[in-house]
């Protein structure tokens, strides 16, 4: 799933119910590429196109995620290319996240954010940034990192739940975790025909398609998300963690992406 501002996107459940069962969910290592196009008020638009590449590898201790979003947007004289890259390592128990996020526009780097986030046994944590150096952010109890929230969404869907709320930290900015409101629903007919790319059929055989929408709310002074969401996203994801289709919507605009390539990656040999 796109988990930053463009690489990102109910029923309240007890925090223990959100976190404890997530470890039982496993996802397959894979590499996928998506074609990206513009959305205008939720409908196909013009002026923006690109590609989104996602890779998830398993290690004996956790997960390594690499993702890149490249967009070309129509300008007054010529198209302007922008690129967002993220590299993350997340522990299998969901208590540690190392992150690096880079943004370039027109071939020039415009931002870089790096750091590490740790969650203690009491559920509270802290993110420490090395870029910008010396910055820290407190993490409230039961904050979820990217892989953990994806696994929990799958767990909830397989259990027949309608959705959940969670605190979500990605590390793309020096800011508090966002409140995420996830709604799990019926797969829309218009998305039922999303095809599996040639060569990736074995990864999808016998798998259930999960559809959900998520709203991301910036934290207020009281630590809660309020008002309109900063952005929203939707996704069609297999129950082994492979995303087939997604959207990211902010204000009146946005993007949608549809899978075009899929391949399996090797699993580690762990003792």
PLM features per residue range, with description:
Residues 8-17:
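Bacterial N-terminal signal peptides
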Residues 24-28, 55-64, 89-95, 203-206, ...:
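A short, structured loop/turn motif at beta-sheet edges
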Residues 1-6:
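Positively charged n-region of N-terminal signal peptides that target proteins for export
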Residues 102-271:
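Mature, soluble, non-transmembrane domains
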Residues 32-34, 50-52, 65-67, 84-86, ...:
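Hydrophobic residues positioned within well-ordered beta-strands of beta-sheet architectures
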């Amino acid at each position: 799933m796109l988990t930053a501002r463009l690489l990102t996107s109910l029923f309240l459940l007890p925090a223990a119910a959100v976190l404890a069962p997530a470890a039982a969910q496993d996802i397959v290592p894979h590499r996928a590429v998506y074609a990206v196009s513009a959305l205008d008020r939720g409908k196909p638009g013009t002026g923006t196109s690109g590609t989104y590449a996602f890779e998830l590898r398993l290690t004996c201790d956790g997960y390594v995620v690499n993702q890149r979003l490249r967009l070309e947007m129509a300008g007054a004289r010529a198209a302007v290319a922008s690129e967002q890259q993220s590299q993350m390592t997340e522990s299998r128990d969901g208590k540690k996240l190392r992150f690096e996020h880079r943004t370039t526009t027109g071939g020039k780097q415009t931002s870089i954010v790096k750091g590490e986030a740790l969650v203690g046994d009491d559920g509270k944590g802290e993110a420490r940034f090395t870029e910008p150096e010396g910055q820290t952010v407190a993490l409230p109890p039961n904050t979820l990192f990217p892989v953990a929230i994806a696994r929990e969404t799958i767990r909830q869907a397989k259990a027949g739940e309608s959705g959940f709320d969670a605190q979500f930290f990605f590390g793309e900015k020096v800011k508090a975790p966002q409140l995420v409101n996830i709604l799990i629903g019926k797969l829309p007919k218009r998305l039922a025909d999303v095809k599996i790319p040639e060569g990736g059929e074995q990864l999808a055989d016998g798998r259930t398609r999960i559809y959900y929408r998520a709203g991301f709310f910036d934290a207020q002074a009281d630590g809660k998300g309020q008002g309109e969401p900063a952005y929203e996203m939707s996704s069609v994801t297999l129950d082994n963690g492979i995303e087939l289709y997604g959207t990211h919507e902010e204000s009146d605009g946005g993007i949608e992406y549809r899978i075009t390539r899929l391949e399996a990656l090797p699993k580690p040999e762990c003792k």
